[in-house]
Amino acid sequence: METSSIVQKPALDEDTLRLARQVFQCVREGDLASLQPLFDHGFPPNLRNESGDSLLMLASYHGHHDLVRALLRAGADPEVANDRSQTPLAGAAYKGYVEVVRALLDGGAQVDGHGEDGRTALMVAAMFNRVDVMELLADRGADLRHRDASGTSGREAAQRMGAEDAANWLRERS
């Protein structure tokens, strides 16, 4: 008798799916009061949606620094990238959320961590002219000369995006 090595994930029932949708909506809205009891009772902090976005990614992307801190305390992994190879730190850098970036770094995010594309949070911040985020990342030890998987530097990426302040900032420091 031959057994298959393929293991299928069990289908989730409608109640479980409804709860997951509600949790993701609470995260987008920053509703920590509704979420904290779930985290206190062991709700999985690394839950991901169909796009690969973790709860931490969505909280970071929407600028909810208190929720980011709560998720990190509950055990969320700050290095989990989504299906587009973006880390929560890169998402917060893209949006320019300095306090979220600070919370992620305080919670263990690697300052030069990156997804498969090799882009660090500093590179993303540079591309979108988020100089205040770049300053925080540099203060925390970010590599100003890092190159992504295609060999592009943060300064080159900033120049291509027309982010002159960021490109000048990097030129002055590297």
What are these regions (language model features)?
Residues 1-41, 50-53:
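Intrinsically disordered, low-complexity regulatory segments in ankyrin-centric signaling systems
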Residues 34, 66-67, 99-100, 132-133, ...:
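Conserved ankyrin/ankyrin-like repeat signature
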